[in-house]
Amino acid sequence: MTELGNDKAMNLLIITGMSGAGKTVAVQSLEDLGFFCVDNLPPVLIPKFAELVKQSGGSIERVALVIDLRGREFFENLAVTMESLNQMNGLSYHILYLDANDQTLVSRYKETRRRHPLSPNGSPLEGIHAERRLLEEMKGWAHQIIDTSQMKPVQLREKIINQYGQQGSPLTINVLSFGFKYGAPIDADLMFDVRFLPNPHYVEDLRPKTGCDPDVAEYVMQHKDTKEFLEKLTDFLGYTLPHYQREGKSQLVIGIGCTGGKHRSVAIAEHLGEAFGKDFSVRVSHRDMEKNK
């Protein structure tokens, strides 16, 4: 089989092509889509590797392998390797070949100041011509060829995600409350400062409690500023989250910060978790809530 997407089969994507044509960008994009990626696997080992993955009991369903000129000594029996894949039951595979014209590849090598692996002491063009000859048979086996000559990395990433991303693939959102006095979280993709909201810390009965307590949450939520802020914030997130999902982002960390991370940020984080939990996989966590007890 040569088409990806059969739920009952292990999906194997083989990525090959010219050095400098974008294989690294492709693999990074596939990793973000949840593919199990293996770089520089000799072609002769592909059937054995596929068999091992099948024996994993379905824990690995989508695999991407990169094969290139680093394994050139194993390219001689490529036809035998492909025939072995064709005869494997429960395997759906697709070969993607990334290419670019000589001028573009030479330009990319000059920009990165890297030497072509087949021309360590000569011009990049000599190595490019040698690589084309080496990969000629592999290109003939490809189910799809993408010419990246006119593509920027972000455009190639978008194409890979659109083609191999699963429709409706889940975006996992971690809403994280924190206190600025303990430092901002370094892994937050989006961060919102709610220190302008009314502070329960100055209400004696509420001070020992947290934003998870109903009376504290009610105190924070009842104010006009909070209601207006949440309306604008939910509108913003409601617009941006689907776009993050379409771009292939699998995880998003939203930081909500107040002074100590005990009252306001906790209440707002809990509210956002409820608001977006119906449409996304949402996890709410409170980094600093217990530090203030």
Swiss-Prot record:
GTP binds at residues 68-71. Keywords: ATP-binding, GTP-binding, Nucleotide-binding. Coiled coil: none annotated. ATP binds at residues 17-24. InterPro entries: P-loop_NTPase (IPR027417), RapZ-like (IPR005337), RapZ-like_N (IPR053930), RapZ_C (IPR053931). GO terms for molecular function: ATP binding; GTP binding. Pfam families: PapZ_C (PF22740), RapZ-like_N (PF03668). Belongs to the RapZ-like family. Displays ATPase and GTPase activities. HAMAP family: RapZ_like (MF_00636). This is Nucleotide-binding protein BBR47_52620. It comes from Brevibacillus brevis (strain 47 / JCM 6285 / NBRC 100599).
